Amino acid sequence: MELLDSFIFISLVKAAVIFGVLMTTLAYLQWVERKVIAHIQVRPGPYRVGPHGLLQPLADVIKLITKEDLVPPYVNKPLYLAAPFLAITMALLSISVIPFGPVIHIGPVTTAMQMTDLNIGVLFILAVSSMGVYGIALAGWASNNKYSLIGGLRSSAQMISYELPMSLAIAAPLLISNTLSLRELVERQAGSILNWNLLSGPFPQVISFIIFIIAAFAETNRVPFDLPEAENELVAGFHTEYSSMKFASFFMAEYANMITVSAMATLLFLGGWMAPWPAAYGSSLVPSILFGISGLVLLYHGVNAVRKRDKLTFPAFGIIFLGIAGIFLLPMVQSWLLPLFWFCAKTGAILFAFMWIRGTLPRFRYDQLMGFTWKFLFPVAMLNLLVTGFLVAWTTK
């Protein structure tokens, strides 16, 4: 019992669980993105490795691990090797303070559903995520390649420029909530969707939310802000000279940053793990209904499938989904499983937006990219913060 109650043991267990789930999520985010873009372009996407391509991430990992790890002779080797490590470390470190749910009680153990609960969690994420640009800048410089250098410089300028409107967009809901703790920030949005920072307060933060999402796309170097990796201009940008797992580290860092900014948007504006309406009106039944319907649909397609493999895989996944629907009805797990569902659903919706935008929009020119933030986004973010601050001060006198 003393071991279970020990802070070190609980922290190690949480770290192992979060790391394992995160690595699996990073691997499958690429599969989901390829599927989403494929369906946008009316093609099947990954389909051969495993049922419906579900084992494609495993095949990609094996391929990257077994590929030859080339180090060009003309690079600055210490900085060249440090760059991908720095990028992925900063990306993973920022996730360590994100709360996935409320404080939970498991037997004698009481713990928060996050790696560590900092009272300055928002500030920590801003500081750590900003350091990720050093990894990209070092990669561009150490590669001793003109395309890599231009990509690194573009990324540095872009991330620094869009950090300002993002910080101003974050400051507005913080003024309303009056806290830098991510857990407390979510707890102050409890009740219903009308209490979320997006819609509540003296000045609903719709503008802040839009600015934050736009800046998040730029911060993560995603379309339409992927100028540092513009293939038609820079070959592959800052990671042109990288191969094997060092190459994969930059992609893992990109997807980890996507998860971080999506989770931040959920926590700051969308009520975190809070349901959109109270449990008395049936919010606790939503996961069971969704998984139950999905399971029945999969069973139906399995019965009517043409291919032999589909006759096995569809019913198997249908039974799994029906089992998950039943688990959500168990009172003993609802206290932590329902909040986790709502948090993942909101974060997943924003991640889907990242993929949707990639499949539909072209990239900006570099002058348009920089002009947009300094001439439009930054002034609007500043004006929004001033109006929010004035109204908060006026209503709390």
From Swiss-Prot:
Record keywords: Cell inner membrane, Cell membrane, Membrane, NAD, Quinone, Translocase, Transmembrane, Transmembrane helix, Ubiquinone
A UniProt-annotated Pfam family = NADHdh
Q: What is its main location?
A: membrane
Molecular function (GO) terms listed? NADH dehydrogenase activity; oxidoreductase activity, acting on NAD(P)H, quinone or similar compound as acceptor; quinone binding
Under the heading InterPro entries, the entry gives: NADH_UbQ_OxRdtase_su1/FPO, NADH_UbQ_OxRdtase_su1_CS
Provide the protein's localization. Answer: Cell inner membrane
Could you state one GO cellular component term attached to this entry? plasma membrane
The membrane topology noted for this protein in its Swiss-Prot or TrEMBL record is: Multi-pass membrane protein
- Where does the sequence pass through the membrane? 7-27, 84-104, 120-140, 156-176, 198-218, 258-278, 279-299, 313-333, 337-357, 376-396
Query: What Enzyme Commission number(s) apply to this enzyme?
Result: 7.1.1.-
Give, as one word, the top-level EC class.
translocase
Q: PROSITE patterns, per this entry?
A: COMPLEX1_ND1_2
Q: Which reaction does it catalyse?
A: a quinone + NADH + 5 H(+)(in) = a quinol + NAD(+) + 4 H(+)(out)
One biological process term from GO is: aerobic respiration
Q: How does it assemble?
A: NDH-1 is composed of 14 different subunits. Subunits NuoA, H, J, K, L, M, N constitute the membrane sector of the complex.
Protein task: NDH-1 shuttles electrons from NADH, via FMN and iron-sulfur (Fe-S) centers, to quinones in the respiratory chain. The immediate electron acceptor for the enzyme in this species is believed to be ubiquinone. Couples the redox reaction to proton translocation (for every two electrons transferred, four hydrogen ions are translocated across the cytoplasmic membrane), and thus conserves the redox energy in a proton gradient. This subunit may bind ubiquinone.
Instruction: Return the PANTHER family for the record.
Output: NADH DEHYDROGENASE SUBUNIT 1, NADH-UBIQUINONE OXIDOREDUCTASE CHAIN 1
Which family, according to UniProt?
A: Belongs to the complex I subunit 1 family.
Official protein name in the record? NADH-quinone oxidoreductase subunit H 1
Q: Which organism is it from?
A: Solibacter usitatus (strain Ellin6076)
